[in-house]
């Protein structure tokens, strides 16, 4: 792990290179020190130029773009190899896994194609890159992985059970990966946010008529929590922190009662 004199990462990889939360986490790291930022997202993504400009404006030492398609798992080894410098190897100090789909909850459980698609991206692709990140960081003997999960995966609800089930799978995988990599000097942080105010979620609320839920946070709040918790070596946090206790209660409500709750 190549850190500067005060422990700041020198190279940060963002899988989901246009993710507003992921970019906010990168920006939070850049407040501490300049770093090389590697953004990986879909070829020709319309948000590419905006993401690169945001990282440059935030003080990145340099910004690199790598084409990354979550569904094309066969291409993932090449993506991760490129992130580690390809023919000129380098360490990646922090890798952020922040790609995913939300989708329309009622459509998802009635549309086989879209249900499979969200499962492939939110879970299968996350496992694919997680294994590869683990291999690389284990070999370098250090590193931090930050995986964006969701409170929706802690206890899957009828209102969004397809999405929630994919996050439950991601959550379990990365918690387990953290245990497996701990002895090799690698730390994995799983973040379980509730609703986060981003362009994507705001558009989703408008399209579906949904309302902002209690405990909704800004992406900057999640970023602050992510950087602080990862630096401290934590393995699991909620955003906001109070959500931990809310979910603790919800997790133990009997199912006949739980299904009647307006959530």
Residue ranges of each PLM-predicted region?
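Conserved mid-core segment of classical short-chain dehydrogenase/reductases
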Residues: 84, 91, 100-116, 159
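Conserved glycine-rich cofactor-binding loop
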Residues: 18-19
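Rossmann-fold cofactor-recognition segment
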Residues: 55-74
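Active-site helix of classical SDR
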Residues: 130, 166
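Alpha-helical segment proximal to the catalytic Tyr-Lys
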Residues: 135, 179-183
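C-terminal helical subdomain
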Residues: 190, 210-248
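Residue(s) in the substrate-gating loop at a strand-loop-helix junction
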Residues: 150
